[in-house]
């Protein structure tokens, strides 16, 4: 049975950036490569002049109604959109959304236990990189045993996901991000950082891990695409 997923993100937009954020695009590339998953994307910069919360709620509900049953939602939670997401989650449940609500992103990855108290409407939390965790959640029924995935109500191990970067499809090579008329790109050749600087939230939470580099063959192909 095909499972539907609406992947949602509210980035802080910059004029130079591609319309689809790189992290969001990487997850899209993974999910769209799987025939048993029907994935739709919803990206709306929270600082866009036309951003209206009530309109966004209506648009999300409209997309969900078209996707029909057997649909989940996955949302990346950032500090600048946390209040908006909390309001959307409450709206989803008050409008009788029955699917699973999956939350990831920095506000989840860098948080300790007690996520259920902060986001009571959510069912599942993913700490760390989301590609493989989401893919497994959407292709297997019931609860899964995946490092970094926490189900609401269960004991929280507060672990991060583990990702084999060589198995992640490239959002650039898969055409998830449109390069046309795009003079600036955000390009990922590695993930992680071996340092643990106190001022930086973008270290790997809970661990000092070595850098993980993408396979050079992928990097070469992306260079050819950009050039």
Ranges and model annotations:
Residues 2-6, 12-13, 143-189:
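N-terminal [4Fe-4S]-dependent radical SAM core
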Residues 3-14, 72-74, 98, 102, ...:
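Conserved SAM/AdoMet-binding glycine-rich loop
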Residues 12-22, 77-82:
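A short, glycine/small-residue-rich beta-strand->loop->alpha-helix junction that serves as a flexible
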Residues 19, 169-227:
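Radical SAM [4Fe-4S] cluster-binding motif and immediate context
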Residues 21, 82, 86, 131, ...:
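Non-membrane alpha-helical structural segments and their capping/turn regions in soluble enzymes
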Residues 21-32:
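Short catalytic helix/loop segments, enriched in acidic residues and glycine
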Residues 31, 105, 123, 149, ...:
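Generic structural signal for small/hydrophobic residues in well-ordered secondary structure
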Residues 40-159:
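Glycine-rich beta-alpha loop elements in corrinoid/cobalamin-binding modules
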